[in-house]
């Protein structure tokens, strides 16, 4: 698999590449200059399972704020830089564990060298990021539009700029909102380089459409063994990105931990408020540290059979439900006690 052979990169106290676990990233949507709000959001993201956090650094005040933010958080901090090379330098001087730049908009080779020199001195990795919106005009013309081949050529051109300055502590990201083209770009670049890849579908959309596009895109890419860190980019609360990323990794067998809830679709045999019950179960289990499968079924006719592959499950009936464990019916429970009974079983799980 590609990710087993990618270069190992140290980001703060975490390692990516070389077969290390795929890490989940998100990005704050607070003003980085507002240390209190930014720290509060990062701590909440940490609690949800975020492994690496990125903050926008559009001003010198934001760059300087990183120093205080870094003191109060427990995961690696990435500074997102555009246009001004001095912000990249200031971010590193104030504790950034990694910087994200597009060498194409940083400026002259001298300015890029100034950034690379500080990164080299401090051992800070640089994420070289390109996306469809920043693709050079000559590459658009060469490939007759925005293409996977053009994105890959652009990314490698920028990598070569930094390599020529004697630095290879790099991560690459290629972002595009077109799922299939983004997948193709990752397939192409994974064949051409062994740098770790940060994977995501950019501008994926709202919670509904963004989750669908991200699940499909990341699923295609990750299932080929490509990708060392991921972000589910959503127009929504950053916490939702973490929930989705964890579920995608777990579904692909790339991360353990957390209860998986499965539930049947509603039909004419449903004898209980299955939609409400399934949602309550999913919310209830979020903070229970088990790695098991829980089934929520809508009737006592097919429920027990359909729940056999789950570790534990409940099936609703008329005023009464069943508690099922490892495919066996354990007991009947009054309908209004189903949720509490399931919770008690989970809290005492052995």
Short names for language-model regions:
Residues 131, 139-285:
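Catalytic alpha/beta core domains of metabolic enzymes, predominantly
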Residues 1-27, 120, 283:
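N-terminal amphipathic alpha-helix/helix-capping segment at the start of soluble metabolic enzymes
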Residues 29, 34-35, 46-69, 100-108, ...:
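Glycine-rich, proline-tolerant flexible connector loops at the mouths of alpha/beta enzymes
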Residues 72-75, 92-99, 120-123, 190-196, ...:
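Glycine-enriched alpha-helix->loop->beta-strand junction motifs that scaffold or abut catalytic
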Residues 86-127:
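Hydrophobic or amphipathic alpha-helical targeting/insertion segments
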Residues 19-37, 56, 75-83, 139-152, ...:
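Active-site mouth loops of central-metabolism enzymes
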Residues 22-28, 53-55, 77-81, 99-101, ...:
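Hydrophobic faces of well-ordered beta-strands that scaffold small-molecule active sites
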Residues 60-81, 114-126, 188-197, 281-283:
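Alpha-helix-loop-beta-strand connector modules within alpha/beta enzyme cores
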């Amino acid at each position: 698999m590609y990710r087993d052979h990618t270069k190992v990169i140290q980001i703060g106290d975490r390692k990516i590449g070389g077969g290390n676990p795929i890490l989940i990233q998100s990005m704050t949507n607070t003003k980085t200059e507002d240390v209190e709000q930014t720290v509060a959001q990062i701590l909440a993201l940490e609690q949800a399972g975020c492994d690496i956090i990125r903050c926008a650094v559009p001003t010198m005040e934001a760059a300087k704020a990183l120093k205080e933010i870094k003191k109060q958080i427990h995961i690696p901090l990435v500074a997102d830089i555009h246009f001004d090379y001095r912000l990249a330098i200031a971010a590193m001087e104030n504790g950034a564990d990694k910087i994200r730049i597009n060498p194409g908009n940083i400026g002259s080779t001298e300015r890029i060298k100034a950034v690379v020199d500080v990164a080299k001195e401090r051992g800070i990795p640089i994420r070289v990021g390109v996306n469809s919106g920043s693709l050079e005009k000559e590459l658009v013309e060469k490939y007759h539009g925005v293409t996977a081949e053009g994105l890959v050529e652009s990314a490698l051109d920028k990598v070569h700029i930094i390599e020529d300055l004697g630095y290879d502590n790099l991560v690459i990201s290629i972002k595009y909102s077109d799922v299939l083209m983004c997948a193709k770009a990752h397939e192409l670049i994974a064949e051409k380089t062994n740098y770790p890849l940060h994977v995501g579908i950019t501008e994926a959309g709202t919670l509904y459409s963004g989750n669908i596009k991200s699940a499909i895109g990341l699923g295609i890419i990750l299932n080929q063994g490509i990708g060392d860190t991921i972000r589910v980019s959503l127009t929504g609360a950053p916490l939702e990105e973490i929930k989705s990323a964890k579920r995608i990794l777990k579904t692909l067998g790339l991360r353990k931990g957390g209860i998986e809830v499965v539930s049947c679709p509603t039909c004419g045999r449903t004898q209980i408020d299955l939609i409400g019950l399934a949602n309550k179960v999913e919310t209830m289990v979020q903070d229970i540290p088990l790695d098991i499968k829980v089934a929520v079924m809508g009737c006592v006719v097919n429920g027990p059979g359909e729940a056999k592959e789950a570790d534990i499950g409940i099936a609703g009936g008329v005023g009464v439900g069943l508690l099922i464990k490892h495919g066996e019916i354990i007991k009947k429970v009054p309908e209004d006690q189903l949720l509490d009974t399931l919770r008690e079983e989970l809290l005492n799980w052995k």
